[in-house]
Amino acid sequence: GMPVIEAFGAEHLRSGLPICYTSVDSVFQIAAHEEHFGLQNLYDLCQDMAGILHKMKVGRVIARPFVGSLETGFQRTLNRRDFAMDPPSATLCEWVMQAGRPVHAIGKIGDIFSMRGITRCRKGSDAQLMEHLADEMRQAPDGSLTFANFVEFDTLFGHRRDAEGYARALEWFDAQIGPILAQSRPDDLVIFTADHGNDPTWRGTDHTREQVPVLVHGQNLAQNQVFDRMIPFQDVAATVAAHLGVVAQGQGRSFL
């Protein structure tokens, strides 16, 4: 993404035309300068394009705003927005909401699920998202779902193949998540996983290693348990549903 902005940023400022590009996954991205093109104009354009591209089964249209100049360099801002296709059927978020429980999204979760089944969404940098996560876990009512996505591992370090930066980010995450887990309540269930890998030491700039870890924390769980099978996303959803006592509407089965 950044090489595209660096290559066409000056032409974008001169012509006023947006920068459009695609990725190997099912996304169409539009980059534009927040000040010269206008942030709302970019959002409106992406919304219009989503109406066309979703019919072609393109999963997401992503607004990629940036600032800066050719002389000072261009930088992306935190105002990214994803315009995703509606999920084809009800998801875990909707199961929980249908049961009368709140669903609190952190990061790009609201965009990923087109705000379906989301009570509220809080955004920001990963550092801000960690603060939001700690705050949401402190005040989460019984039976609620808090769903967080930390995207900078992918955008800042994975795609850019910055192994040292990735390592520092993991160390930061480890240091931050410990106190958050320590404040969890006896009946809380915390699951760490990802939707794909992105090895910063591998060639190219695309996602890698689709088999990602599933780590589970809970004060009432058996310690050091190792699952003896692959765990698909649908089983993660079924597990959370079973823990919360809501009806699972998918094909998954709980692994706990």
Where are these regions (language model features)?
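Feature captures the catalytic ectodomains and active-site-proximal regions of enzymes
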Residues: G1-L256
